[in-house]
Amino acid sequence: MDLHQQRVVVLGGTSGIGFATAKAAACRGAEVTVVSSRPASVDRALADLPPGTHGQAADLTDTDEVHRLFQDLGSIDHLVFTAGEPLALMSLDTLDLEKARDFFTLRYFGALSAVHAAIPYLRPGGSITLTTGIAAQRPGPGWAVAASICGAVESLTRALAVELAPIRVNAVAPGVVRSPLWDSMTQASREQLYRDTAAAIPAGRVGEVDDIAQAYLYCLTQPFATGSILTVDGGAVLA
């Protein structure tokens, strides 16, 4: 499937994996709109994205604002949801339940709200691609909240693929990727995470956002894929 003149909306498309996906789709001829809650982030992203890329600011945790966003955008072909604040590992003995609920607000309910709002505007043959992570398959200590979110998104993906057919619904499950996702960690801790991960997995390195963007393009363009969780982790689930 060619993306030429296809309308692609990337929620969370101003940084990290979302930005790389938006750029890759635009380079394949798509008409891309990136969305972030921060207008300044939208402006910075547009300065670095191919000409013809559009941007809008919207609070993806505000249901009414999300519905207005899609009303303004009109008909689209593909929805990509990569939005998410930097993760914080939380062991059970230090668990902050309010913070845990906050993580679900954007990463799970934000995705569900976006799909609900976008459905009336998705053209026939369109697709939805959500974002999960390998924590659902192989969690480590401190990953109870993150693993739960990833598991919820994977279940949501499969349920939506059935309910919304023939609209295709898939999700990408990255492993550890060098991206702003880890900005809540100190630089030393972050670099140690990258080194430890690279040493432990078959690929021998951590992922880059451009690696993961190719997985999203696959989900956008593969007409026979739906209900799939595409794991792109350098073999981390095998390590």
Model-predicted segments: where are they?
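Conserved glycine-rich cofactor-binding loop
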Residues: 7, 14-15
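Conserved mid-core segment of classical short-chain dehydrogenase/reductases
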Residues: 84-101, 183
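Conserved Rossmann-fold SDR core element
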Residues: 154, 163-178, 225-232
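Rossmann-fold cofactor-recognition segment
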Residues: 49-64
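Catalytic Tyr-x(3-8)-Lys segment
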Residues: 190-211
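C-terminal substrate-recognition "lid" of short-chain dehydrogenase/reductases
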Residues: 205-232
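Catalytic loop of short-chain dehydrogenase/reductase
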Residues: 100-104, 108, 113, 127-165, ...
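Hydrophobic positions on the long internal alpha-helix
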Residues: 80, 110-118, 156-157, 215
